[in-house]
Amino acid sequence: SNPAVSADKKNEMQAAATCIDNSTGNVVAIIGSRTQDLDGYTLNRAYQSYRQPGSSIKPVIDYVPYLEKGNTPDTIVQDEYIQDGPKNADGTYMGSITLRTAVSLSRNTVAWNVLKELTPKVGSSYLLNQGFHKVWMDKEYNAIAIGGFTYGVSTEEMAGAYATIANDGEDRRVTCVSQIKDTRGRIVYDSSG
């Protein structure tokens, strides 16, 4: 870190992560921030901060709905310049490529066109159905195809979405609660089923 910027430790970079058991949705590790020597309230960035997900959202909002519509990894898609649209990170365009290649190379133009075909409303409905909290207002904007949200997403939401993909589409709601008992010790909720 740059000592001129972070000598007081207030401006150092922060990070957050949520790791879950994909088969259950149970949180196994969570990082909410750097260690802080503060009394009182501290922000847990894994649950309370919403950030732009960038390309990590593409499988969830673009490609899963596109595959469910009947396309395959071998479907031919167009990687081409889009007027008033995104550019690819490397500044190049490959023309006709397979969806598999587009995903593996994270081609922004393909993600943009896929969501445009599906409609942002359809793509955002996948997020809403998986418990994403702050995406409802972006359902008309194609920028969400490449992670451009008004408020962003949390690491907890992203972990749940990827767990759903890992479980062949079976929803995995993320939870830190493993069990709840009533005053008599009877189990009223058990996350294991």
Please place each PLM-identified region on the residue numbering:
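Periplasmic/cell-envelope proteins involved in peptidoglycan metabolism and beta-lactam response
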Residues: S1-Y47, R51, S56, D74-T75, ...
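Second-shell loop/turn segments in exported
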Residues: V5-S6, N44-Q52, K87-T92, T98, ...
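Extracytoplasmic
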Residues: E12-A15, N26, S56-I57, T72, ...
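Glycine-rich, acidic and aromatic/proline-enriched surface loops and short helix-turn segments
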Residues: C19-Q36, E68-N71, G95, S104-N108, ...
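Active-site SXXK
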Residues: G25, Y50-V77, A102, G160-I165
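Extracytoplasmic/secreted proteins, especially bacterial periplasmic and envelope-associated proteins
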Residues: N26, Q52, I61, T72, ...
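Conserved catalytic neighborhood of penicillin-recognizing serine enzymes
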Residues: N71-S124, D171, T183-G193
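Active-site-proximal helix/loop microenvironment
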Residues: H133-V188
